[in-house]
């Protein structure tokens, strides 16, 4: 369904980011100790009409595995 394609970079969900749903850049820096996070084009295969211009998050130079002890990294 749509959830598999939905990401912290999806334009339609970007306004919903915040404490519980970090932006791509914040997610990568905090959860992976990465230099930065960037969004790249990733057309939705499951939900193209609900997620036009879909994007996914990519962490640049991640130094650690995801910090699962931090609740804001779980999503």
Swiss-Prot record:
Q: Name one GO cellular component term.
A: extracellular region
The record's listing under Pfam families reads:
Macin
Is Secreted tagged as a keyword? yes
Is Disulfide bond a UniProt keyword of this protein? yes
Q: Which residues form a coiled coil?
A: none
**Which cysteines are cross-linked by disulfides?**
2-9, 24-28, 31-73, 39-47, 57-59
- InterPro entries found in the cross-reference section: Macin, Macin_sf
Q: Which UniProt keywords apply?
A: Antimicrobial, Disulfide bond, Secreted
Q: Which GO terms describe its biological process?
A: defense response
Where it sits in the cell: the answer is: Secreted
What exactly does this protein do?
Has a bactericial activity.
Family to which this protein belongs: Belongs to the macin family.
Identify this protein by name: Theromacin
Its organism's taxonomic lineage begins at:
Eukaryota, Metazoa, Spiralia, Lophotrochozoa, Annelida
